[in-house]
Regions:
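Short, acidic/polar
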Residues: 21-34, 105-116, 199-206
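Acidic (Asp/Glu)-rich catalytic clusters
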Residues: 30-36, 58-65, 165, 209-211
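Enzymes and membrane/adaptor proteins characterized by extended Gly/Ser/Thr/Asp/Glu-rich
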Residues: 37-152, 180-191, 219-227
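Conserved, mostly hydrophobic/aromatic
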Residues: 41, 73, 117, 159, ...
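Boundary/entry segment of secreted carbohydrate-active catalytic domains
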Residues: 2-27, 159
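Acidic, His- and aromatic-enriched active-site or binding-groove loops in soluble protein domains
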Residues: 99, 141-165, 190-207
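Short, well-ordered coil/turn segments that N-cap beta-strands
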Residues: 12-14, 37-39, 66-68, 122-123, ...
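Phosphate/diphosphate-binding glycine-rich loops and adjacent basic-rich segments that engage nucleotide
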Residues: 169-197, 202
Length: 227
């Protein structure tokens, strides 16, 4: 039962992002989508059987809650949840090795992945990755847009231009930076033992893109100088 106390707590915490178990909605999931504090849905590989079924699932979600955000981690390379019927977008590391064609390639990658997702009913992908590739983090690795802050910022701007052209919002991640932490935060608690000044170098990417970023995803990392 949603008591006044629970409702007050929910409003303090804000809307939550929920997941779906399979390729069709269950009655329980429909009730959860109807809850006023459900703000978005995140899809995974388990929610994908075909492009047609994905469109049907997204349509069903939007029918229950018109305007709810349907999201996915679909960056290209090894982080691409949907394969069959979708373009195999190269990793960001592959895209950024095209010399003077790098910006055009990244813009094209952003447009292709965003336009295909939009056609399926997905509203947003969690991209770009704004973590600097220090050569330490395997979970970031070739997902990174550069090995220094200027390269990351420049390449992210190109990728976001493609997303924008297809009508998709962006999400910079993993704030304030996951490139130095070695552990995979999906299975462990990574730590970053750098100084505050060094971490602020990573964070400056977000400052440089502040007028263009529409959302951010935080890192699940313990920053020893702060935490």
């Amino acid at each position: 039962m949603l008591t006044p106390k629970k409702l007050a707590l929910a409003h303090t915490l804000g809307p939550v992002v929920v997941d779906i178990a399979g390729t069709v909605l269950t009655e329980h999931e429909i009730r959860r989508l109807e809850h006023p504090m459900t703000g978005a849905v995140i899809l995974f590989t388990r929610n994908f059987a075909s492009a047609e079924m994905l469109r049907a699932l997204c349509g069903a979600i939007h029918a229950v809650r018109p305007g709810i955000l349907i999201t996915v981690d679909h960056e290209g390379g090894r982080v691409q949840r949907f394969r069959e019927g979708f373009t195999e977008v190269p990793s960001m590391a592959a895209c950024r090795t095209a010399g003077d064609q790098t910006q055009a390639r990244l813009a094209a990658a952003g447009y292709v992945l965003a336009s295909e997702l939009r056609a399926a009913g997905v509203d947003m992908t969690f991209a770009p990755v704004l973590d600097i590739d220090y050569g330490r983090s395997a979970v970031i690795g070739n997902r990174s847009l550069g090995s220094d802050r200027d390269e990351v910022e420049r390449n992210a701007r190109a990728l976001m231009s493609g997303l924008r052209l297809a009508g998709m919002a962006n999400c910079g991640k993993h704030f304030p930076g996951h490139g130095w932490a070695e552990a995979d935060s999906h299975v462990a608690c990574p730590t970053d033992n750098r100084s505050a000044a060094e971490i602020r170098r990573d964070l400056s990417i977000y400052r440089g893109l502040a007028l263009e970023l529409e959302s951010i995803m935080t890192a699940h990392v313990a920053y020893q100088c702060f935490d």
